[in-house]
Amino acid sequence: MQFKNILVVCIGNICRSPMAEYLLKQNYPQLTIHSAGISGMIGYSADEKAQLCMERIGIDMSPHIAKKLNAELLKQADLILVMSQNQQKHIEQTWPFAKGKTFRLGHWQGKNIPDPYQHDQAFFDETSLLIQTCVADWTKHI
């Protein structure tokens, strides 16, 4: 299936989902890619530690502004990528129409992506590497 509109979701939309969003945008500039948070920290920039992770690989996340997940974003998406099984379950229960197009970013590895929020830079670095690997795993499916 060819996806045209991808939505990446985490909790606050300041750490994991923006990193995945910007990696996907770099790999697929022809697609529409957004991110949002279940409990979005609306109006916040990406976490400085997440921005540093992306800067190290040549990606500027400074334009990112966090937003809260809503039904309209979910309806527009052909593919919804979440960070954990709990997030997938929450979305599918709250918005049943999202079932069948909501998957974990770590689906192909059977992994959840741990939340680095309020952890040290080393934890962010590990999370960033896992996100990069998981984004690469989606390549043959997007």
UniProtKB/Swiss-Prot annotation:
Pathway given in the UniProt record: Glycan metabolism; exopolysaccharide biosynthesis
A Pfam family of this chain: LMWPc
GO biological processes: polysaccharide biosynthetic process
EC number(s) recorded for this UniProt protein: 3.1.3.48
Activity control: Inhibited by ammonium molybdate, sodium orthovanadate, N-ethylmaleimide and iodoacetic acid.
SUPFAM superfamilies xref list: Phosphotyrosine protein phosphatases I
Function, as annotated: Dephosphorylates ptk. May be involved in the production and the transport of exopolysaccharides.
The family this protein is said to belong to: Belongs to the low molecular weight phosphotyrosine protein phosphatase family.
Protein name per Swiss-Prot or TrEMBL: Low molecular weight protein-tyrosine-phosphatase Ptp
